[in-house]
Curated annotation (Swiss-Prot):
This is Phosphoribosylformylglycinamidine synthase subunit PurL. Mg(2+) 1 binds at residues 93, 531. It comes from Rhodopseudomonas palustris (strain BisB5). Keywords: ATP-binding, Cytoplasm, Ligase, Magnesium, Metal-binding, Nucleotide-binding, Purine biosynthesis. The gene is purL. GO terms for molecular function: ATP binding; magnesium ion binding; phosphoribosylformylglycinamidine synthase activity.
Length: 736
């Protein structure tokens, strides 16, 4: 028998994250007071994390279609066609709140959840990436959070057997109370064998697969839909516990069952667990669902209907099976040592019925739980425009060389080797370009193709000007894919913002989305999947707006690619794109001058596309020997990164007349690349650039083992490498 359920009170409703008007909507919808289990189901399905109730109307403005898009937003992951009946399946998703409370488990289950999203579609995962945002290094919790999150990301990916090939790691005081853990997974599938979540057919068996259900993760989706306050540590029981070895078994069992043509529909149990997966399958298929919780495999005794429906135990799937394949499917899952249980059936009623102990614990209209959840058009105000900061208003350093050494040893610009060396980035044997470059490159097995993968965003730009910041996040992903020789095909986004009930925060969200949409349209770079994470605030203090962009591009021939490393001495260094010396919101202004001010650099999308297409053409023609896009830190930081990657120095000319030296070297103008070419190709390249109207000038030559700027002291690469690579391990070791 099911245990008695508590009485519904206003306090109980509020504790479930439901506003009074939302509860009234429930009463109007079902014509009675909900049961405790029903209240939990509504709370799970109508929270921000599952329903996107504050963001859906704005997400509709994103471009999602292209001839190569096989599946856009709305499924577990997006799917794009790369030819030869091959498809790339990918998505990015956040696990922010759990990772702040319990960093190791929060990060592991974030990775596990996004991997399930990919293999649920029928794809074998081939790569993971991540974007990690931590608080100020001096904050007492930051070191602990970095350690736990990085160990969790590596622990799950390494054990599961998928390489973690790239990402971002940043530090800023605005993340002190809310870190961000955005995980991206990429997989390969046959283009004609993609599996979706929509159930079809009446009377079809609904099967529970994978690990047993426990009480871990209770209320996780609801927690992710509210801001933190005092006592957030008490929410530790809502953090799920992951088992990468069980997930590996689940992957192999699912792919085998799919290959045997057993599956009608499949959905992983992520946020809101059994509730969300069952409702989504039924609602998308215009069907009802009857569940019998007595059949659910559990690992704890005495679990109530409420607990089973809202548990977020990991490594679980829900599947609608072809009835004649039931015994075959069960044999496959038993072989892999996983639970297999028929827990319900599809019905024609369009109702969601949950039974436990012979008693109906929930009987609700399924469409209103899923597709027709509340939708808000929240008030928003446009972010005020900040003044342009002119280069002559920014103090010059005592020495350009000294400033470079200092910048390379700052938290955001230092080498993140300490992070990515904890990840197995070569498992599987298909990683062609490892972390540390512009984009990772992963081979598509059994052929010449490669995938270029990147994650990008510059939150300080998004804070200063959400529209330009949104454009720039997409543009940088496009540039990074281009810089390795890839043709950018599509993106997934992970939109991390504060409390949407504050008009200024909603204004940031709307502005960033408009910028993302404009850039995606200009580049023919559609959005095929994504995630929205709101309420990233603690005690009223929100994060920087952080719309992470995960980009995927294709190399038809991975041998025609580029890296950022200088290849040989005596090669010409070319700067492609115009430099005006934009210092507003630059790392130089922040970390050398102590000012976070001004408008961010504008993004000219037409120039971005023209410059990128030319650079990609140079790579494919074999003319470019090294390529690097310019971003944080500007020209001189990018040059130092190329020199360190190749262990070859450079002799650099003085800035041209008319531009302030520190603005030339550290300005963050957009749409620029550094390219090296052999001496024999120099005149041809310069002539070609002039003919197509692309700004290109030689700024130096590769040489020796120092960076030597005309009029400045030479910087030994060994000293630069020490500055660049020691800050993070020293910090994590408590030395700074």
């Amino acid at each position: 028998m099911s245990a008695p359920e508590p009485k519904i009170t206003p306090e109980l409703v509020a504790s479930h994250g439901l506003k009074p008007d939302e509860y009234q909507r429930i009463l109007d919808l079902i014509g009675r007071e909900p049961s405790f289990t029903e209240l939990g189901i509504f709370s799970a399905m109508w929270n921000e994390h599952c329903s996107y109730k504050s963001s859906r109307i704005h997400l509709r403005g994103l471009p999602t279609k292209a001839p190569w898009v096989l599946q856009g937003p709305g499924e577990n992951a997006g799917v794009i066609d790369i030819g030869d009946n091959q498809a790339v399946v990918f998505k990015m998703e956040s696990h922010n709140h759990p990772s702040y409370i319990e960093p190791y488990q929060g990060a592991t289950t974030g990775v596990g959840g996004i991997l399930r999203d990919v293999f649920t579609m029928g794809a074998r995962p081939i790569a993971c990436l991540n974007a990690l945002s931590f608080g100020a290094p001096e904050h007492p919790k930051t070191r602990h959070l970095v350690s736990g999150v990085v160990a969790g990301v590596g622990g799950y990916g390494n054990s599961f057997g998928v390489p973690t090939v790239g990402g971002q790691t940043r530090f800023h005081t605005r993340y002190d109370g809310n870190i961000l853990v955005n995980a991206m997974a990429v997989g390969l599938a046959d283009a004609d064998k993609i599996f979706l979540a929509a159930a079809s057919g009446v009377g079809m068996p609904i099967v529970y697969l994978g690990s047993k259900t426990g009480r871990d993760g209770m209320g996780g989706a609801t927690m992710a839909s509210a801001e933190f306050g005092e006592g957030s540590e008490e929410k530790r029981p809502t953090v799920q516990v992951g088992d990468p070895f069980a997930e590996k078994l689940l992957l192999e069992a699912c792919l085998e069952i799919m290959a045997n043509d057993c599956v009608i529909a499949i959905q992983d149990m992520g946020a809101a667990g059994l509730t969300c997966s069952a409702v989504e399958m039924g609602a998308k298929g215009d069907l009802g669902v009857d569940l019998d919780l007595d059949a659910v495999p559990t690992r704890e005794t005495g679990m109530t209907a409420y607990e089973m429906m809202l548990s977020e135990s990991q490594e679980r799937m829900l599947m609608v099976l072809k009835p004649e394949k039931e015994k075959e499917a069960e044999a496959i899952f038993r072989k892999w040592g996983l639970d297999f249980a028929v827990v319900g059936y599809t019905t024609p009623t369009k109702r969601f019925v949950v039974k436990h102990g012979g008693k109906a614990m929930a009987d609700l209209p399924i469409k209103e739980l899923g597709d027709e959840a509340p939708l808000y058009d929240r008030p928003w105000v446009e972010s005020p425009k900040l003044p342009v900061i002119h280069a002559r208003e920014v103090n010059a350093p005592n020495s350009i060389a000294d400033a470079l050494e200092k910048l390379l040893a700052t938290p955001d610009l230092c080498s993140k080797r300490w992070v990515w060396e904890q990840y197995d980035h070569v498992i599987g044997g298909n990683t062609l370009q490892r972390p540390g470059g512009d984009a990772a490159v992963v081979r598509v097995q059994d052929g010449p193709k490669g995938l270029a993968l990147t994650v990008d965003v510059t939150p300080r730009y998004c804070e200063a000007d959400p529209f330009e910041g949104g454009k720039q996040a997409v543009a940088e992903a496009w540039r990074n894919i281009t810089a390795v020789g890839g043709k950018p095909l599509a993106i997934t986004d992970n939109l991390n913002f504060g409390n949407p009930e504050r008009p200024e925060i909603m204004g940031q969200f709307v502005g960033c989305l408009k910028g993302i949409a404009e850039a995606c349209i200009a580049f023919d770079f559609p959005v095929v999947s994504g995630n929205v994470s709101l309420y990233n605030e603690t005690s009223g203090r929100g994060i920087l707006p952080t719309p992470s962009i995960g980009g995927v591009g294709l190399l038809d021939d991975f041998t025609k690619s580029a890296t950022l490393a200088f290849k040989a001495e005596g090669e010409a260094i070319l700067l492609i794109g115009e430099t005006h010396g934009w210092l507003g919101q630059s790392v130089y202004l922040r970390d050398i001058c102590g000012r976070e001010e001004g408008a961010p650099p504008p993004v000219d999308l037409a120039c971005e596309k023209r410059h990128g297409d030319v650079v990609r053409g140079m790579i494919h023609a074999g003319t470019a020997t090294a390529v690097h896009d310019l971003s944080d830190g500007g020209l001189l930081v990018a040059l130092a990164e190329m020199a360190l990657a190749g262990s070859i120095g450079a002799s650099l000319e003085a800035p041209p007349d008319g531009i302030v030296p520190h603005a030339w070297w550290f300005g963050e103008d957009q749409g620029r690349y550094l390219v090296t070419v052999k001496e024999d190709d120099l005149l041809t390249v310069l002539s070609k650039m002039k003919s197509v109207g692309v700004s290109c000038e030689q700024i130096g030559r590769t040489a020796g083992h120092t960076l030597k700027i005309e009029g400045e002291r030479a910087l030994d690469l060994k000293a630069l490498r020490h500055a660049h690579e020691h800050w993070l391990p020293d910090y994590m070791g408590g030395k700074n």
